[in-house]
């Protein structure tokens, strides 16, 4: 996959095949028409999501790095996806997400700055429709999340976000032990 090779060239860690297959499955089961992704990378996870979405579905992907988005645009086009199937927004997720439509998305995939996971969740819960799913990548964070002795900013932030999800009565969630861990949480309703 060209997008995976490009990721290695620019120093981006793409989602693994197991995590990608899980994203494809979720997008397909949800018959997703609208998905938000935080952390475009070079398009690896976006390709999995696009392939699982309904025909004509639109992926909105947010990333700070315009170069990463250029590479993702190339990957999506090379894979045969028409430009109207994806919307790439360069900018901080915390600036972009508040401008997106409430309850307008079937799936929200979070794979951006780990320190901002809790804030991403606050936006995602507003963006996802009832019955939709919020997915956090790196929920195990190299097996550091379960170790209380690990207190670095990323690990602590992921741990806090996962606790927020677990404490929220509006959600039913599951931790999928694929790749570096995917936490999937469905908005009940």
Q: What are the roles of these predicted feature ranges?
A:
Residues 1-107, 114-135, 139-189:
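A short alpha-helical cap/connector motif
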